[in-house]
From Swiss-Prot:
Gene3D superfamilies in the record: Amino acid/polyamine transporter I
Organism annotation: Schizosaccharomyces pombe (strain 972 / ATCC 24843) (Fission yeast)
A Gene Ontology BP annotation from the UniProt entry: amino acid transmembrane transport
Record's protein name: Amino-acid permease 1
This protein's GO CC annotations: fungal-type vacuole; membrane; plasma membrane
Length: 594
C-alpha cells in the first residue's frame, strides 16, 4: 500500500509549529468571540486538551499530514512509501502459486495500467480539483448510487489495511521465535505502537515514516547488489545460477489459474498509488506536477517492483518450501549463506509493515471525512478535535485493528488472506470506476461543447488509455471470479473459496444494492453533468476579477502617505537579496529518483 503524503512537493518550505484552536466563548456583552490560537507548548495538560471534541455542529477540514512535516520527511517518504508488505511478503506466495513468468507478466500489465490511471486522475483533478477522495468523482460524473458504494468500499479498503498489516507483522516476527508465543502478545505490542505514533500527531508520524522509508530504500538497494552476487555465484554458498530457476522448476506454475491468482497480491501491492495523481492534480502548477508524478511512478514501478521482483525470481525457485511463510528476500539471502543480513532484512520488513499501517490510519480518516461531507455517513464520523484531527474516525480505525487478535486462533493465519482480499479485489473496482469517470468527463465536455483547451493538463490519447484501464480491470475481475470458483489449489468450489478471492467486489455489490435506502437514485445525461462547480478555469477567472478589483482600490491608495517604516523596508530588501539556498544531498537524491 502507498502513503498519502508521498506526492507532496519536495521543495515545500517547512510549516510552522501546529496551533491549538481554542473553542469560541461568549464574552460579557453576549457576543461570540472568534477562535483564539495559541502555540502548542510542552504542557502535559495542553496535550490532552487538544483532543477535546468541537461541538457537534462544527466541522473542519482535516489537516493533511503534510501540513506539519519538514522537507526531509516529505523527501524520504516520497522515495520509500511505495515499498511495503506487497513487495516484501506477498510476492513470496504469488511466486509459489504462479511461478516467475506469471508474476512478472502480471506486475508489468498492472504497472502500465497504474501509469494510465495517474494520467487520467491527474487530468480530472486538474480540471475539477478535489481535496477529499478520488471516489467523489463517481457521484458527480456518473451516478450517486455507484459513488455511494465506491466511497464506502474505499473506506473499508483503508480500514482493513491496519489489521492486515498487523497480521502480516505477526508472521514476520515468527522468523525469530524459537518457541511458540501467543500472537495476541505481538498484536498488542504492534497496536500500542500505532496508537502512540498517531497520538502525538503528524510530526511523530513523519519521523517514524522518515526512518522506515530510509531503511526500506537502503535494504532494497542492498538486496539489488546481493541478489546479483548470489546469482553470479560469488556468495559464500552456492554457485552460478543465471536463469536456471526459470527452466528448472520452470517459468509458470498452475497454468492460467496461477496467473489469475497473482492479481489480488499485485493489486494489494499497488493499491494507494492512485493518490499520487489526486495530490498532483491539486497543486498550484499541475502542468509541472503531473509529468513529475508520472515520472516518479515510472521509476518506482521500474526499480522497486519490476527489477526487484525479477531478481527475486532469479535467486528463489517457486518450489522452495519456505515460500509463503518467509519473505523471499530472506530466503534468497539465506540460500546465499549470508548469516547476519537475514535478521537485518527481517527487522526492516517489520518496520515497513507497521509504517503502512500508520499511513492507513490517516487514509481511512480522510475517506471518512469525504463520506460525511457527501452526507453518506453518520455525522459523528466527522467529529474533530481542537486541532482539526478526525478523532472519531481515528478511533474507528484502531478499533478495526482489533480484528488482528483473531490470529491467536488456530486458523488465525487466514485472516490476512481475507483482509488482503478486500484491498486487492476492491482495488480493481476503484480503479475501473476511476477510468470510467474520466471517460464520462471527456464525453460530458463534448456534449456541453466545452473545448479541451480549458484543461489545465491534457495528455494526448488519455481517453484511449482510460479504455485500456477499463479493459484491464474488467479482465482482472473476471479472473478473480474464475479463480474464486476454481481455486488454484484444485479444491472443490466452495463459498469460502469464492469470498476469500472476491470479497472486495462483493462489498461493493452489497453497498450498491442498499444504496437506494440512503441515496436518491440519479440518472443524469451528459448534458446535465455538473462541470462548473469548483472548475479550475472558472475559479481562476473569479480570482482574477477579485484581484483586479483589489488592484484598482490599491491604486487609489497610492496618493496616501507611505507609513511603512524604514526598518520594514530594509528587512524586505534583505529578504529580496537573500541568495537561494543550496539543495541538500537528500534533496538531490530525491530529485534524481522522483
Amino acid at each position: 500500500m502507498t502513503s498519502f503524503t508521498e506526492s507532496k512537493k519536495l521543495d515545500e518550505i517547512e510549516s510552522p509549529v501546529p496551533e491549538i484552536i481554542v473553542p469560541s466563548t461568549t464574552n460579557g456583552n453576549g457576543t461570540i468571540e472568534s477562535y483564539k490560537e495559541k502555540s502548542v507548548g510542552t504542557s502535559f495538560l495542553d496535550f490532552f486538551r487538544s483532543y477535546k471534541l468541537r461541538p457537534d455542529n462544527e466541522f473542519a477540514e482535516v489537516h493533511n499530514s503534510e501540513d506539519f512535516l519538514k522537507p526531509r520527511h516529505l523527501q524520504m517518504i516520497a522515495i520509500g512509501s511505495c515499498i511495503g508488505t506487497g513487495l516484501f511478503v506477498s510476492t513470496g506466495k504469488s511466486l509459489k502459486n504462479a511461478g516467475p513468468g506469471s508474476l512478472m507478466i502480471n506486475f508489468i500489465i498492472l504497472s502500465a495500467m497504474i501509469l494510465a490511471l495517474i494520467l487520467s486522475l491527474g487530468e480530472m483533478c486538474c480540471f475539477l480539483p478535489n481535496q477529499s477522495s478520488i471516489t467523489m468523482y463517481t457521484g458527480r460524473l456518473l451516478n450517486n448510487n455507484i459513488g455511494f458504494a465506491q466511497s464506502w468500499l474505499y473506506f473499508w479498503i483503508w480500514l482493513t489495511v491496519l489489521p492486515s498489516e498487523i497480521s502480516a507483522a505477526c508472521e514476520v516476527v515468527d522468523f525469530w521465535t524459537t518457541q511458540h508465543l501467543n500472537p495476541a502478545i505481538w498484536v498488542t505490542i504492534f497496536l500500542a505502537y500505532v496508537v502512540l505514533v498517531n497520538a502525538f500527531g503528524a510530526r511523530s508520524y513523519g519521523e517514524c515514516e522518515f526512518v522506515s522509508s530510509f531503511l526500506k530504500v537502503v535494504i532494497v538497494i542492498i538486496f539489488f547488489f546481493v541478489a546479483i552476487i548470489i546469482n553470479c555465484g560469488a556468495a559464500p554458498k552456492g554457485g552460478y545460477i543465471g536463469a536456471h530457476y526459470w527452466h528448472h522448476p520452470g517459468s509458470f506454475r498452475n497454468g492460467f489459474k496461477g496467473f489469475c491468482s497473482v492479481f489480488i497480491s499485485s493489486a494489494y501491492s499497488l493499491s494507494g498509488t492512485e493518490n499520487i495523481g489526486t495530490a498532483a492534480g491539486n497543486t498550484s502548477n499541475p502542468q509541472r506536477a503531473i509529468p513529475s508524478a508520472v515520472k516518479k511512478v515510472f521509476y518506482r514501478m521500474g526499480f522497486f517492483y519490476i527489477i526487484t521482483i525479477f531478481l527475486i525470481t532469479l535467486v528463489v525457485p517457486y518450489d522452495n518450501p519456505d515460500l509463503g511463510n518467509v519473505s523471499p528476500f530472506i530466503i534468497a539471502i539465506k540460500n546465499g549463506g549470508i548469516h547476519v543480513l537475514p535478521h537485518i532484512t527481517n527487522a526492516v520488513i517489520l518496520v515497513s509493515v507497521l509504517s503502512v499501517g500508520n499511513a492507513a490510519v490517516f487514509a481511512a480518516s480522510r475517506n471518512a471525512m469525504a463520506l460525511v461531507k457527501q452526507g453518506w455517513a453518520p455525522r459523528f464520523l466527522g467529529r474533530v478535535d481542537q486541532k482539526g484531527r478526525p478523532v472519531i474516525s481515528y478511533l474507528c480505525s484502531l478499533a478495526m485493528a482489533c480484528i488482528a487478535y483473531v490470529n491467536a486462533a488456530p486458523d488465525g493465519s487466514v485472516v490476512f488472506d481475507w483482509l488482503m482480499s478486500v484491498s486487492g479485489g476492491g482495488a480493481f473496482v476503484i480503479w475501473g470506476l476511476s477510468f470510467i469517470d474520466h471517460i464520462r468527463l471527456r464525453y460530458a465536455m463534448k456534449a456541453q461543447k466545452i473545448p479541451d483547451t480549458v484543461l489545465p493538463y491534457k495528455f494526448p490519447g488519455s481517453v484511449y488509455l482510460s479504455y485500456y484501464g477499463v479493459l484491464i480491470n474488467f479482465l482482472a475481475l473476471c479472473a478473480l471470479v474464475y479463480i474464486s470458483i476454481f481455486p488454484v489449489t484444485h479444491e472443490k468450489p466452495s463459498a469460502y473459496g469464492f469470498f476469500v478471492s472476491f470479497l472486495g467486489p462483493s462489498v461493493f455489490i452489497a453497498y450498491l444494492l442498499i444504496s437506494p435506502i440512503f441515496v436518491k437514485p440519479t440518472f443524469q445525461s451528459l448534458k446535465d453533468v455538473d462541470l462548473t462547480t469548483g472548475r479550475y478555469d472558472l475559479v481562476n477567472s473569479q480570482m482574477y476579477v477579485a484581484e483586479s478589483s483589489t488592484s484598482e482600490l490599491s491604486e487609489k491608495d497610492l496618493t496616501k502617505p507611505n507609513l511603512q517604516s524604514n526598518d520594514n523596508k530594509n528587512s524586505e530588501d534583505l529578504e529580496s537579496n537573500t541568495p537561494p539556498q543550496k539543495k541538500s544531498a537528500l534533496q538531490k537524491v530525491a530529485d534524481f529518483l522522483c
